[in-house]
Amino acid sequence: MDNYRDENRTKGNENEVFLTKENDQSASYSARNVIHDQEKKKRGFGWFRPLLGGVIGGSLALGIYTFTPLGDHDSQDTAKQSSSQQQTQSVTATSTSSESKKSSSSSSAFKSEDSSKISDMVEDLSPAIVGITNLQAQSNSSLFGSSSSDSSEDTESGSGSGVIFKKENGKAYIITNNHVVEGASSLKVSLYDGTEVTAKLVGSDSLTDLAVLQISDDHVTKVANFGDSSDLRTGETVIAIGDPLGKDLSRTVTQGIVSGVDRTVSMSTSAGETSINVIQTDAAINPGNSGGPLLNTDGKIVGINSMKISEDDVEGIGFAIPSNDVKPIAEELLSKGQIERPYIGVSMLDLEQVPQNYQEGTLGLFGSQLNKGVYIREVASGSPAEKAGLKAEDIIIGLKGKEIDTGSELRNILYKDAKIGDTVEVKILRNGKEMTKKIKLDQKEEKTS
């Protein structure tokens, strides 16, 4: 569905991401997909960033950090009180010293056993982790400023990570992020033994930020398996493996916990804005980790690392796409090379991006009708929307019985709750009057040249 146009597209491989959470305040953090780009300059992000084309992000209010200096609060009175308390604590410590030793010994043994298990798992699984280099054509200009495609050459634009999840019939297949491979004229994959091979892009999907690559299985000795991300619990140990900052630090292992499940992030992609479900983790995720696996302690893929909060005052907030969302996308990309989605055929803008005087004076909206819904800028000729009688400057306020406030909500309902061939009811406002239209959803025809 080609709803959002170029004004929503991001530069290079960097995307704007916002945390969304119900009933939070209007503060927002900017975040970025974690792909290493050698030519990318550091960019500053403020608390609020204006976005064009109706890119709407929710927010997460994190409050005010309060730091208490240490060692500056002692007085004579508190020193005496502390001394008195120390005597009590000393007695308590003495009476439980043997138990403490047992507890400490038991804890150390547990940590050693747990650490050994993780080390064994990482050692076993590392051959399935790969580095991915995105090569893009760069024209060589002559002294007179002219350029020729004949003199262009592929140069490294960025790099990321991936994981081999399937091997059959002499081929191996890698899952990674779409933003790792997007725009590439060719792709190189670095394997565990140092071998570098050319990869073929089987298919990619910008709205879920996933892609599948194919390589020869000549040097592939290990395949990782998907786990069940619905079994994840907050506080559970997870491990991230990838190539932060490129191949020099290949297969770097970081450990953390599941900080939260069923988070929602609203992300601007080259295909428009979308909201995706993610796992939050504090396992260190750095530029170049994109596309690498988030693993449980059994060595199963429970997520694909995709993005992180990137702010000076923020530490340890990274996100991974859950394995249960990754698997069906990977399977469809393998079988069809693309994700087939229902198509309406409108170019749209969140209504709140339209000036209120235009909403009132031109669109005929008033009161509670203002700033809620999706403004149709253009209806594609021959599209399902045109056949259903939708027109430019209509406002979509409902789909399949659910209220619509933003394009992201419309897209989520359309892609998750409907399928090609369905006939759905669309509620609209036209000149301030509410009406309902029935649209038979179709698949967008790919342009051919």
Curated annotation (Swiss-Prot):
It is found in: Cell membrane. The keyword Metal-binding does not apply. Residues 78-110, 140-150 have a biased composition (Low complexity). It comes from the Bacteria. One of its GO terms (cellular component) is plasma membrane. It holds the Pfam family Trypsin_2. Gene3D superfamilies: 2.30.42.10, Trypsin-like serine proteases (2.40.10.10). Keywords: Cell membrane, Hydrolase, Membrane, Protease, Serine protease, Stress response, Transmembrane, Transmembrane helix. PROSITE patterns: PDZ. Residues 348-437 form the PDZ domain. One of its GO terms (biological process) is proteolysis. GO terms for molecular function: serine-type endopeptidase activity. Substrate binds at residues 288-290, 344-348. The active site is at residues 179, 209, 290. Residues 1-35, 73-116, 140-163 are annotated as: Disordered. It catalyses: Acts on substrates that are at least partially unfolded. The cleavage site P1 residue is normally between a pair of hydrophobic residues, such as Val-|-Val. Degrades abnormal exported proteins and responsible for the propeptide processing of a natural pro-protein and for the maturation of a native protein. It also plays a prominent role in stress (heat shock, ethanol, puromycin and NaCl) resistance during active exponential growth. PANTHER family: PEPTIDASE S12, PROTEASE DO-LIKE 8, CHLOROPLASTIC. Inactivation results in compensating overexpression of YtvA, especially during stress conditions. Belongs to the peptidase S1C family. This is Serine protease Do-like HtrA. It comes from Bacillus subtilis (strain 168). The lineage of its organism: Bacteria, Bacillati, Bacillota, Bacilli, Bacillales.
